[in-house]
Amino acid sequence: MQNDAGEFVDLYVPRKCSASNRIIGAKDHASIQINIAEVDKVTGRFNGQFKTYAICGAIRRMGEADDSLLRLAKNDSIVSKNI
């Protein structure tokens, strides 16, 4: 959608679950969004960037949120692959 100035504006952009790729609805109050900080490998300090993951309520309800976050962190090389 464009406004009068020709800029693209969206009123609502739905979030998607990072683990299951489902759309997180507005009434899904059990869903979470977590930011995991990226750290410098030498100093161990926060470098100003982070990865954002959204987990829907259905994944949390099944008790799979921790496994899903670990899998996502391994895929993004935040956690080592041999854990």
UniProtKB/Swiss-Prot annotation:
Keyword Endoplasmic reticulum applies: yes
Any one Gene Ontology BP term: cytoplasmic translation
Localisation: Cytoplasm, Cytosol; Cytoplasm; Rough endoplasmic reticulum
Pfam annotation, one family: Ribosomal_S21e
Keywords: Cytoplasm, Endoplasmic reticulum, Ribonucleoprotein, Ribosomal protein
Any one GO cellular component localisation term in the record: rough endoplasmic reticulum
Annotated coiled-coil segments of the chain: none
Keyword Ribonucleoprotein: yes
UniProt-recorded Gene Ontology molecular function terms: structural constituent of ribosome
Protein name, UniProt field: Small ribosomal subunit protein eS21
Organism: Ictalurus punctatus (Channel catfish)
